[in-house]
Amino acid sequence: MAIGSVVFAAAGLLLLLLPPSHQQATAGNIGSQWRDDEVHFNRTLDSILVPRVVGSRGHQQVREYLVQSLNGLGFQTEVDEFKQRVPVFGELTFANVVGTINPQAQNFLALACHYDSKYFPNDPGFVGATDSAVPCAILLNTAKTLGAYLQKEFRNRSDVGLMLIFFDGEEAFKEWTDADSVYGSKHLAAKLASKRSGSQAQLAPRNIDRIEVLVLLDLIGARNPKFSSFYENTDGLHSSLVQIEKSLRTAGQLEGNNNMFLSRVSGGLVDDDHRPFLDENVPVLHLVATPFPDVWHTPRDNAANLHWPSIRNFNRVFRNFVYQYLKRHTSPVNLRFYRT
């Protein structure tokens, strides 16, 4: 990913998911209802935290693990495989992994991250713990800890489904450019934009237009991360994360006293897997730590330098956010910059 310099003005908040005052007081009950499963999280992270450059054996193993995990969690799983020429290696096979609950739903909440690790010719052992093994583990662990809700009350809803997207080929093989980056998300966005579903497919919206918001996780796992709002149209969703964190902290459900989610709009953007979706007018909630962790793209981005209290805190806030979004969803949410 890369930091850009696009500046925009915030026109106000879309307070879609802010907990009402009585619910703020009982946030601890929500936090207790959906308990941590650290055994699952640690096992998941261990399975992903290996060198996984596109085309490597480790990459293939992690891909298979993601498919197996999604199937085991009750998702309908699809592998979006394609070949493309890249710098250094020539032609490689990429594979996005997508899991869906309620695939026939009108709209979707999409949670995403990338699973490939960066290629360093002088560091074949680079594992990219924050970039993005931990985000992968967070998505699977969120599905696991919310499993009782997702597999019973939520299943077969027609208004909203849940997508977990594990992008391949986010990392540049040489230097970050529009061409040498986000290979998987470009392919998947184009595929979703070209297809429609339903018995009257010609009249149906494009599949990409059924995504209400793409929530993209990246660079998570270091000590005391900070998350700002990047896009005006999803600032209300970011504000809900701020409020959930505050409520859980008040209820004694979080560790330490460092706030992760900041009530501020960033003056710059971070280029990442969301770019092709943003180009297709998909609302994006970009949860990337800024400033970047000091271990970013160094050999120190490994398990030894992860900060477990920060990871647990993020997991708890994010789990509640996902649950509240799905639980309170009653009608389509259109946050697009222009209407479709």
Curated annotation (Swiss-Prot):
Catalytic reaction list: N-terminal L-glutaminyl-[peptide] = N-terminal 5-oxo-L-prolyl-[peptide] + NH4(+)
Top-level taxon of the source organism: Eukaryota
Annotated localization: Secreted
This enzyme's EC code(s): 2.3.2.5
Signal peptide start and end residues: 1-23
Protein name per the record: Glutaminyl-peptide cyclotransferase
Regulation: Inhibited by imidazoles (imidazole, benzimidazole, 1-benzylimidazole, 1-methylimidazole, P150/03, N-omega-acetylhistamine and 4-methylimidazole) and cysteamines (cysteamine, N-dimethylcysteamine and N-diethylcysteamine). Partially inhibited by PDB50 1(3,4-dimethoxyphenyl)-3-(3-imidazol-1-ylpropyl)thiourea.
Phylogenetic lineage: Eukaryota, Metazoa, Ecdysozoa, Arthropoda, Hexapoda
Family under the similarity heading: Belongs to the glutaminyl-peptide cyclotransferase family.
Annotated glycosylation sites: 42, 156
Name of the gene this protein is made from: QC
MF-aspect GO terms: glutaminyl-peptide cyclotransferase activity; zinc ion binding
